[in-house]
A protein has these predicted regions:
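Non-ligating segments of multi-cofactor redox enzymes
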Residues: 1-266, 271-274, 278-299
Length: 299
């Protein structure tokens, strides 16, 4: 927009000494890990709820993340449901009922919110990423970037393999499902596969599974396109340091924060954003915030 172009021009003309002073002042303000801590608490609570419900046989939340029942309501992971229907080669009506509930939930909350706020593998991969970054600083490992289009290719491969074999191929190797079942029913040999993935991410490619392979993220990303819950970027206060992109699982959604690239003074991040809140916690100027579309008009 014209207003965005004016802001970009003003930033180009700004006195560098004054800008550096403003940056130093912004970094002096305390900022913690508020959203990260909230997210970790929710993720751990959700997964422990499954385990406790099964262990105490209270039958409030039954099953696992792939398919469950909450006080009588059937909940079926969208990707799992798709795999089952592809394997059976027809639409299963009872499966659709449970799927619709989950579909509505993640359409409202933002599809990939599932990844950062519920998926147990995401939490382990986040911790593994910290180890990877520590080793990278010591120059003991390097980060091999891959083409993110690989995720689409893997989605198609899993779908075709399931359709052709009549077997839910992805569910057999899904770290999300493996970890969820292990937490509820006890560990199994499949955890070795999860350990191998984490080792690969620590030594070779940071967050490789979530960035380049997992079809769950792609499916939920599409579901969350129209979600009212999003992270909003405000151009005016941004110093374009790029700290937010360094902590982001999907840094391509933050391309708009690169100096000169924002097309408007306020930009909503794309559907691939996991709403993890790390960028919100990291930004020293508050240029990135959570937002619910339309809520400001109602208040």
């Amino acid at each position: 927009t014209e207003r965005a172009q004016q802001v970009h021009e003003l930033k180009r003309m700004a006195n560098k000494t004054e800008v550096r002073a403003a940056i130093m002042l912004a970094h002096q303000k305390p900022h913690g890990n508020t959203w990260r801590n909230r997210r970790w608490a929710v993720l751990i609570a959700v997964n422990l709820f499954f385990a406790v419900s099964f262990g105490l046989d209270i039958q409030i939340l039954e099953g696992a993340l792939t398919a469950s029942r909450f006080i009588g309501f059937h909940l079926i992971d969208l990707n799992s449901a798709l795999q089952v229907m592809l394997a059976h080669k027809h639409i299963i009506v009872n499966l659709l009922i449970g799927t619709m509930t989950v579909l509505v939930i993640w359409m409202l909350l933002g599809g990939r919110t599932f990844c950062s706020w519920v998926c147990p593998y995401h939490l382990l991969a986040e911790w593994a990423e910290k180890l990877h970054l520590f080793l990278a600083r010591k120059k003991l490992v390097t980060d091999q970037n891959m083409n993110r289009r690989l995720r689409t290719a893997f989605w198609l491969v899993f779908a075709l393999a399931t359709f052709g074999s009549g077997y839910t191929v992805f569910e057999a190797i899904s770290p999300t499902g493996i970890l969820s079942r292990a937490l509820i029913y006890g560990p199994g040999v499949a955890l070795l596969w999860v350990a191998a993935l984490l080792l690969f991410e620590i030594v070779i490619s940071r967050r490789a599974w979530c960035r380049y392979a997992c079809p769950i993220g792609l499916t939920y990303g599409v579901v969350g396109i129209l979600s009212p819950v999003r992270i909003k970027y405000k151009l005016d206060g941004c110093f374009h340091e790029g700290d937010c992109r360094k902590v982001c699982l999907v840094p391509h959604v933050l391309e708009t924060v690169v100096k000169g690239r924002a097309v408007d003074t306020e930009v909503t991040l794309g559907p691939d954003c996991t709403r993890c809140g790390l960028c919100v916690d990291t930004c020293p100027t508050g240029s990135l915030t959570f937002d619910i579309k339309g809520l400001s008009k109602l208040l």
